[in-house]
Amino acid sequence: METVLKALRPTLRLAKLEGDAAFVFAPTEKIDASMLLDTIEGCYFAFRRRLQNIRQATTCMCNACVLIPNLNLKFFAHHGAFVRQRIAGREELAGTDVILVHRLMKNSVAEATRLQAYALFTASCVAAMRIDPSALEMREHQETYEHIGEVAMWIHDLEARWKHELEHRRVLIEVNDTETVLETMLPAPPPVVWEYMTDPAKRMQWQVGTDRVDQANPAGGRRGTGTTNHCVHGPGAIVEEILDWRPFEYFTIRATVPGLGPTTYTIFFTTEGAGTHLQFRLKKLKNREQRDLWTGGAREQWLGGLGRWFERLAELLTAEMAAREPEPPVPVSRHSAPSHGH
């Protein structure tokens, strides 16, 4: 549970622990489709890596440890209204939609699909996310609940996403292929910094001098590998293409920069205390004309601009974190292995 909660937060806020399940939520205006999908998949990937580590580190043959390979996670996502109320001194979420998201846990998905690891999204959640579920290879599903009726849903296969994660070729700038490095500390955890650096609306808040960021996503409407951005600065524009996308860890972009031409860079996100160590690596410039431009003034202009942007970003993140409600502490497991996953 500790691994799961750490991966879900701070994108999602813990409402309550319910046995071996965690009830989490986020206001609609605080999260978009890409962040929700990246957070869910990232949580599942962290869970699978944790299971691998436990299997490799233990020789215990007790029943709990023997059953570790059978553990899995399921996610249930719904979009709706809720009210906050205090019950026995504790704040809880209530309402018809809160009841529905709990009812989703009783379903026939395993029987219908044989999937053991999945994320289940109601049709209302998919509509709010503004994605094309078919293009994202989700499966249509339907359940009927007493006093609620038929509920249309979409199933996202997390086992397939894990397989893709393991097989997908990484594209990143290695240290020995780096032209220059820019590093800074930002006062927020990686998921928050990631959102500010990848959401076009949030980029406009700190990229001073940018008139607009036009984003085109691959089929399905989700940010990731293949996404292109047109960052318009007066008469010029920087055209970006995402080559690799590892949420909250790093992304790699090929960009065409006015006055410099095509460049490739990777930005790494590393947790340090309550903040994020950000490292920008620019790929070596091997074109002679580009190198002349770089040493002739483009380097100072480019890195100076990035430095000013990151200063503004730090100001925004400081205000963002100060405005957030304090998170309850993550419970620390007393055992080396989780008991269940839902």
Per-segment meaning from a language model:
Residues K283-G341:
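A conserved amphipathic terminal alpha-helix motif
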Residues M1-G42:
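Catalytic NTP-binding/metal-coordinating core of nucleotidyl cyclase/transferase enzymes
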Residues T256-G261, R281-R288:
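Short, solvent-exposed aromatic-acidic interface loops
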Residues E167-P218, H335-H342:
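Hydrophobic ligand-binding cavity/cleft-lining segments
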Residues M204-Q205, D214-T264, E272, R312-L316, ...:
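Glycine-rich portal/gate segments that line the openings of hydrophobic small-molecule binding cavities
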Residues E29-E140:
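Catalytic beta-strand-to-alpha-helix segment of the class III nucleotidyl cyclase homology domain
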Residues P10, L51-T59, Q116, K202-G220:
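A short, aromatic/hydrophobic, helix- or strand-capping loop or linear motif
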Residues A128-V181, A188-P191:
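C-terminal tail/extension regions appended to the core domain(s) of diverse proteins
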